[in-house]
Amino acid sequence: MSTLVCFHAHPDDECLATGGTIARASAEGHRVVLVVATDGAHGEVPQDLEPGETLVDRRAKEVAASAKVFGFARLEMLGYKDSGMTGWSQNSDPGAFINADVEVAAQKLAKILKEESADAVTIYDWHGNYGHPDHIAVYKVGMRAAEIAGTPNIFQMTTNRDAFRRMRDMAMKNPEIVSETQGIGDFDPDAPADDGNPMGEPESVISHRVNVEKYCDQKKLAIACHRSQITDTSFFLNMSDDIFKLAFGTEYFIKVGESGPARDRWLFE
């Protein structure tokens, strides 16, 4: 069996884009470790915080619950502050993850990679999939940490821009899908995202297409753990099983050192 370390930016990032891969790896008996870079302090603030409870407190509880759903063997928080989206005032906070010294942050992650004798680590693609500053920092720190630790396999999570476009065009022919996905037809995967680049990567550079339909129920359960960010009325939780599988039943990775196009492969082949 192998050890997989999943490095994410915020509590809840573990769910949608890599959750099926995590669930599958755990179910197959691999050791799976979650490392979260930031405290998620700049997410949605729920109305039901207890006296003295902060959003950071709540999100720490939520990610711990999600980790149990997925079967993580270990959860580590690096303790950096959430940087917020591009242009937010929080970007200038000295404690924000985007302002961390890459070498220092990478040493923290590398320590975990070494402790775990990690066979593989997941991070994000070069622009954080959709340009979020903290996601881009995960890429930079993750790449350096893997180099320091000698982790042999690096998988960069991404969105298949071409597959998303095909799904959108198909969905537009089905009113039920349009309704359940809250206007998917209005989303243009080729439009500039938070950093000015389109979301994800083209199919031609993606190495791994992972079918995780079998684990979509676990993904939903883990998403539901993050109640401060995703309410009962969220379309994520109210999609029919078939449409959820259509939208989130496949996950995509670029394995460093390998090329596309995307094809059906498992991380531990």
List PLM regions with ranges:
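Active-site rim/loop-helix segments in enzyme catalytic domains that contact anionic ligands
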Residues: M1-S117, R144, I148, I254
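Metal-dependent de-N-acetylase/amidase catalytic core
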Residues: M1-V5, Q90-N91, G95, N99-E269
